[in-house]
Structures are given as structure tokens and as C-alpha cells.
């Protein structure tokens, strides 16, 4: 049983903490919070131990939230830390993990140099075995890599061109925008996503562009893939249908908008309305000779959660990629095939 600490209890951290509680081979020691907001109150109500910076203990106790100890205490009590702090903050915590000789999983908001390896479970799990510091790539990069590595099973992927329509903010981020604008992210080409993909697939010819749209629900990707050999559409659809963490969306559902997909998640009683699978619109799959085009939606709040669970097992050499991915999927109810 591996003892896991989660440093940060926001959008990703609370989902990772809940996922760890569902794993048969992991034990959640507690979570770290810096302010006694509603997420801290909910964690306390769930019975999760809360650790805070030394200077914040009084503030938490005055708010009525018991403190189990400092963040240093949390790190010491664990075998491995999943750092889900805001972008760039994880690198500031790394010296503490090093001080106590603890393995750590970082998120895609950190620079690749913070870790020994950037990670995508379907692409390079075996390369991450035993690595002390692993960086789970961002939500958009996770979706790109899942898709690319899946289609690579049909025949070698030689070139990728992708356009990313990014959501402006998560639903709880009330101070972010835009409200009524499309914003290049950035106007220069390629966007950072191409470099991030190359941190996992080193020599792939990939160019990405991105724009921020005034929505909070999901990202959308429009991707053009050039393959080494000619392929048939049925082969592409088959590999997408039979790969875990990818689901197909049929036009029969009459649910193709991201808002409608959120409603599907609600009706399926998905926790927090999460869809951690890449959602490929099957009608969008176009194949001509060695060229493949497709469109898919990405739920940014949950897609990296199973990757974090697998990264824990890879770092600690708990089990093989096949076994870890299977157990993670089963414990979290992650599908393959068609969403409905």
C-alpha cells in the first residue's frame, strides 16, 4: 500500500485525492491547502486530513477547520507527493520533496525541466518506471498524446497539425475571461502544446495553434495527422473504439455540443459531471490515403486525473502499464467505445 500526499486541493487536486481513495493499492495521507475556502471545508467534511503552511494554522483553526500538521509533516508522512499547486508553484515546493527524499508527481503547468520525464500513460508509461520526479502533461497535451499514440497503433504517425480551441476558464474561475472575445493563445506558431507533445514523443513533426474562446466547459481540438502508410477509415475508428480513455460520440445521440455532453455526464451520474475520456465525434473522422482528420472534445478538469494515478504507480514501480491502466479505469469507471 503506497502512502500518497496531495499538495493542493483545487480543480485537479480534489479530483486526484478522490481518485486515490478509490485505488486498492493506495492510501491518501491528506491534502495541503493554503486558505480555508469552501474546498477546505468540504475536504474536512469528507474526513480528509488537511495540512497547511505553518503561518496559516491559526487562520484555519479560527475558521473551524482542524489542522493535521504542516505541509512538511504531510510530505514526511507520505511515500510520494502529487503536486497539484498552481502553475509554477510546484517548482517552488520541489526542494521540500528533495529534502525529505520523496518522489513527486508534477502537473503540466510546470516547466518540463522540473521532472525527470514528462508523462502520458498510453504513450510512455514504461519509460517513467522508477523515475523520482514525473510531470503529467497538461490537459490539452494529454488529449493530443492519447489520440496520437492510439492512431500510431494503426501505422506510424509522421506529422501532426492541430488547432486547439481552449476554454477561457474553469467554471469556478470567476475572475478570468474573456467574456466576449476570441484571443490567440498566442498568435505566434507553434503554440506551446507542440513542444509539450515533443517532451514525450521526441522527434514527432507537430505544429499546433491555439485560441481562447469564451466558454468554461471544455476544449475542442481539430487535428490533421499524416501517417506513414495508407489506412482505411474503419481501421481508424476501430482503434479509437477499442482504446481505453477514448470514447466516441455518435450523431445518433443528438448531443454534439459541449454543453450537451456535460448534460450527458449529468444524466450518466458522472461524479462532478466529469468525462476524463477524450470525446471523439465519429462523424468527424475523415480518412484519405495516409491522411486522417478528426475532431474531439476535452474535459479539462478531469482528463489528467487517471494519468496522475498511473504516474504514481510508474514512479514507485508498483505494476506494469497494462495492469495500472486497467485498475485505474475500473476504479474510476473510465470507458472505451461509445459514451452511450
Swiss-Prot record:
Keyword terms: Cytoplasm, Glycolysis, NAD, NADP, Oxidoreductase
GO biological process annotation, one example: lysine biosynthetic process via diaminopimelate
A GO term from the CC aspect: cytoplasm
Catalytic activity: D-glyceraldehyde 3-phosphate + phosphate + NADP(+) = (2R)-3-phospho-glyceroyl phosphate + NADPH + H(+); D-glyceraldehyde 3-phosphate + phosphate + NAD(+) = (2R)-3-phospho-glyceroyl phosphate + NADH + H(+)
Any Pfam family matching the protein: Gp_dh_C
Positions annotated to bind D-glyceraldehyde 3-phosphate: 138-140, 193-194
InterPro entries found in the cross-reference section: DapB_N, GlycerAld/Erythrose_P_DH, GlycerAld_3-P_DH_AS, GlycerAld_3-P_DH_cat, GlycerAld_3-P_DH_NAD(P)-bd, Glyceraldehyde-3-P_DH_2_arc, NAD(P)-bd_dom_sf
Pathway in which this enzyme or protein is active: Carbohydrate degradation; glycolysis; pyruvate from D-glyceraldehyde 3-phosphate: step 1/5
List of residues binding NAD(+): 11-12, 109, 167, 300
Highest taxon in the source lineage: Archaea
SMART domains, per database record: Gp_dh_N
Primary location recorded for the protein, binned into one broad class: cytoplasm
GO MF annotation terms: 4-hydroxy-tetrahydrodipicolinate reductase; glyceraldehyde-3-phosphate dehydrogenase (NAD+) (phosphorylating) activity; glyceraldehyde-3-phosphate dehydrogenase (NADP+) (phosphorylating) activity; NAD binding; NADP binding
Subunit structure: Homotetramer.
Protein name: Glyceraldehyde-3-phosphate dehydrogenase
Organism ancestry: Archaea, Thermoproteota, Thermoprotei, Sulfolobales, Sulfolobaceae
